[in-house]
């Protein structure tokens, strides 16, 4: 057991200043290809300005984020299910309108 006075020396002897990077793909294969490049391209949100998508948020958007963050898992899944149903209904409506446009010949390109 280390003495109280020699504890710092023991801990400092365990430190390693070796830099472990992925310079050798044979020794350190990347678990998920592209993750290292992606992580390097991301900026630190603490020191840098907020990303562009966050700068364009309005107060209503923040309220929606807070509301979604406060939902339980079941409620969030119900919300997602509702959005999927809405997207499906919009797709059906768009399909009907495209078919209608085809029958009315308003989508044909002008032939010269």
UniProtKB/Swiss-Prot annotation:
UniProt-recorded name of the protein: Protein lin-52 homolog
GO biological process terms held by the UniProt record: regulation of DNA-templated transcription
Family of this protein: Belongs to the lin-52 family.
Species: Tetraodon nigroviridis
Lineage, uppermost ranks: Eukaryota, Metazoa, Chordata, Craniata, Vertebrata
Regions annotated as coiled coil: none
Pfam families linked: LIN52
Assembly with partners or alone: Component of the DREAM complex.
Assigned GO CC terms: DRM complex
């Amino acid at each position: 057991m280390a003495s109280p006075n020699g504890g710092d020396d023991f801990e400092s002897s365990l430190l390693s200043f070796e830099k472990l990077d992925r310079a050798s793909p044979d020794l350190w294969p990347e678990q998920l290809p592209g993750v290292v490049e992606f992580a390097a391209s991301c900026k630190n949100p603490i020191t840098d300005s907020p990303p562009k998508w966050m700068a364009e948020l309005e107060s209503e958007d923040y309220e929606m984020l807070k509301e979604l963050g406060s939902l339980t898992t079941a409620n969030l899944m119900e919300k997602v299910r509702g959005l999927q149903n809405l997207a499906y209904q919009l797709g059906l409506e768009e399909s009907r309108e495209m078919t209608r446009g085809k029958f009315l010949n308003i989508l044909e390109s002008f032939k010269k």
